[in-house]
């Protein structure tokens, strides 16, 4: 048993079993040395220190978010199938799946804020998992958050809920129109959160990021970097003059944390403040790499059809969303987040692309050890590996 400042006794499983007596405000050193959860200390401090559950906290973004929370003095519990790739005295790991209601309930014990990041991403391609994890898993943790009385629930959604927008910039009032299963499942998660807010009063913030870049990011972007590093030609669709916005993982983490500190339901679109066209961005990384890669334009329609066919046959790592958006303009109006959250992105498209490429070059030898996260691991190029050589047939 652990007593908080108010004198009420709170049971802390391993603490009671291990010490067999009531403890008065144990020190952080005691918590580190014992097998007691760090959350026991937070309970006994009368909830002065905030506690956060980060689902998917061992994934690419979840791990960066956890680190930023820890730097701000928050106690963090990571709920994931894989352990995080770092340690910290105020970090706790709980292994489990978002589809296990009992495990989710256990993960929420003693938590103030939830950052829900677990998702099957477009690279996964397993349509059943899009729905069971992105939708069913979100329903479970939302239900249990309501039952537990969570202070704030932050849901990391996706710009994929908008599909290929008819006009830009996209605002929070733009009607969602997902074009493939990943976007539909993420939108379903948003609806679950809104319904819990309306029905049960759950305080929810929905954060929709643009495509994420930053140190440690692999996935599809690693294919681009491999081609650039080898001096191979790089494709753009329809000239590459589509304005395309990214967001740095650190800027996204800052936005999520800021959203967790604002009371009341809100939705925020998050992206870079400075960005240009896809062609301009590729020229930046090619110039930085100094490897002689050239940009070659290929037609959008036939390329998208071929890409979707290769994906359907399991011959390409790209999903439908990749081929849909690569040649289309997509960028957010971030003024709402700037006004309400004080959101001030530090990275432009060019800066984050160069940083991500530099990280890739510095860590090539250890790539492939990213654990279970698809964004922390390289992907197999499959049939896509032939594309740069086919581009040699195009003049320019």
Swiss-Prot record:
Q: Which UniProt keywords apply?
A: NAD, Plasmid
One Pfam family, short name: Epimerase
Which cofactors? Answer: NAD(+); NADP(+)
- What does the UniProt function comment say about this protein? Putative nucleotide sugar epimerase/dehydrogenase.
PANTHER family assigned:
BIFUNCTIONAL POLYMYXIN RESISTANCE PROTEIN ARNA (PTHR43245)
Family as reported in the entry's similarity comment: Belongs to the NAD(P)-dependent epimerase/dehydratase family.
- The molecule here is called Uncharacterized protein y4nG
Instruction: Give the originating organism.
Output: Sinorhizobium fredii (strain NBRC 101917 / NGR234)
Lineage, highest ranks first:
Bacteria, Pseudomonadati, Pseudomonadota, Alphaproteobacteria, Hyphomicrobiales
